A protein has these predicted regions:
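Radical SAM/AdoMet-radical enzyme domain recognition
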Residues: 53, 57-72, 80-182, 190-192
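Generic beta-structure capping elements
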Residues: 26, 38-39, 127-131, 194
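Conserved alpha-helical substructure of the radical SAM core
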Residues: 2-99
């Protein structure tokens, strides 16, 4: 039997082993970025239709048996889901998972950074389109830049790898590209313009 047909490993269409799982824990978000969501919000999936944490843990256990080694939590905004941190602690304890990371807008994240560092969260992608408070408000419709920057500094202080995801928008934040890029000269931060 060829290794590509092994039932214990998943492969993509190019024959590469699949080792990475993105797990969306919610579709809800506490920001209203104009490029993502109308100001009044959207109709969310009913809570009873979301996978429970127990179901997600079981899914990850099955996926580790098929070769998955890295799990990234996403959303919406993962931290709007109740009890996310205890769930992350349980995920980190699953044998075979050697890379736990997440994508966040950073508004609710800072208080959880010490626990994230303790359980071995390796990396965080932080959505941050500007360092200017007024432009942040104009883009997200929320005045939360100070909270996001607390998360930014807490992650750096904790030694968690930090990558900034910045959506580039002509007429909205072009003037912020250089200041965001400058972060990479001064700090151990990667900035990705999308």
């Amino acid at each position: 039997m060829s290794s590509l047909s092994s039932p214990s490993t998943l492969y993509d269409a190019h024959g590469r082993p699949l080792e990475y799982l993105r797990l969306a824990v919610t579709d809800r978000c506490n920001l209203r970025c104009f490029y993502c969501m109308p100001e009044e919000g959207i109709k969310y999936m009913p809570k009873h239709e979301l996978l429970s944490y127990e179901e997600m843990l079981r899914l990850v256990e099955i996926m580790t048996g098929l070769g998955v080694r890295k799990v990234r939590l996403t959303g919406g905004e993962p931290f709007v889901r109740r009890d996310l941190v205890p769930f992350m602690e349980r995920l980190a304890d699953i044998p075979g998972i050697n890379d736990l990371s997440l994508t966040t807008n950073g508004v609710l994240t800072a208080p959880h950074v010490p626990t994230m560092a303790r359980i071995g969260v390796k990396a965080v992608n932080l959505s941050l389109d500007t360092l200017d408070r007024q432009r942040f408000f104009d883009i997200t419709r929320r005045d939360e830049l100070p909270q996001v920057m607390r998360t930014f500094h807490a992650l750096l202080d904790a030694g968690i790898q930090l990558k900034i995801n910045a959506v580039v928008m002509d007429g909205r934040n072009i003037q912020d590209l250089a200041p965001l890029a400058e972060l990479t000269r001064e700090l151990p931060v990667e900035v990705r313009f999308i």
